[in-house]
Amino acid sequence: MKFLRSVYAFCSSWVGTIVIVLLVIFFIAQAFIIPSRSMVGTLYEGDMLFVKKFSYGIPIPKIPWIELPVMPDFKNNGHLIEGDRPKRGEVVVFIPPHEKKSYYVKRNFAIGGDEVLFTNEGFYLHPFESDTDKNYIAKHYPNAMTKEFMGKIFVLNPYKNEHPGIHYQKDNETFHLMEQLATQGAEANISMQLIQMEGEKVFYKKINDDEFFMIGDNRDNSSDSRFWGSVAYKNIVGSPWFVYFSLSLKNSLEMDAENNPKKRYLVRWERMFKSVGGLEKIIKKENATH
């Protein structure tokens, strides 16, 4: 009984509260706010998320805000406890290779060994399993459009039917921007190689082992792996758990918040306490009524 009273007294103290909060942040969940529109369609600017820190193992604990590791990376994989790897199509929170303190959220398009094409039509995926299993694509992507390049079958937009928030602009602006960068000698600003494939200009990349090709659902308004490269497992942080609060921001185009200040900082009640899957159900329901 005395021990329990001591534990209660410690937990009730300022020091105990700080220790408990840090332990939760280190090993269970951490709060983030989405500032940009790269995942619009699924996650919006102003969505405030709890991120599940144990989805892909336990990352090396870091002190919040200053992102200072509290212990060495003994395994050199960014994780205290190694776990599952992100699967294709999952939404993942990570630190991109060109940053040290910023957290991004994108959808994992491809895993190590996969080949990716970005064309004027959109993204194509060649899963590495199909190199040894000729029926792999037919089994796993039965209704998808496919195209043959270099003697290999690639799947067009493999996650778009399952995840309705994924979308492109009509003229695929990002493809033309990348083409312009590549032809003007600015290849250092993109991670994919511009090649001619069967008379068509395409961007190509093969994903390294234990790396992941992360793309925003808002395909034409996203800084992602097309530009700064694939993400190593050591940079993987976790997965979105649920939206605990959501506000419209100045850049909320759907509400014309930039031109109408009264539309800023409005609560999006319908998004609160929804997981990514829950938000996608709302999208499917809205699409069915239009």
UniProtKB/Swiss-Prot annotation:
Matching InterPro entries: LexA/Signal_pep-like_sf (IPR036286), Pept_S26A_signal_pept_1 (IPR000223), Pept_S26A_signal_pept_1_CS (IPR019758), Peptidase_S26 (IPR019533)
Protein name: Signal peptidase I
An MF annotation (GO) of this entry: serine-type endopeptidase activity
Entry EC number(s): 3.4.21.89
Membrane topology: Single-pass type II membrane protein
PANTHER family: CHLOROPLAST PROCESSING PEPTIDASE, SIGNAL PEPTIDASE I
Catalytic activity of the protein: Cleavage of hydrophobic, N-terminal signal or leader sequences from secreted and periplasmic proteins
Protein localization: Cell membrane
GO CC annotations, alphabetized: plasma membrane
Family listed: Belongs to the peptidase S26 family.
Keywords from the named record: Cell membrane, Hydrolase, Membrane, Protease, Transmembrane, Transmembrane helix
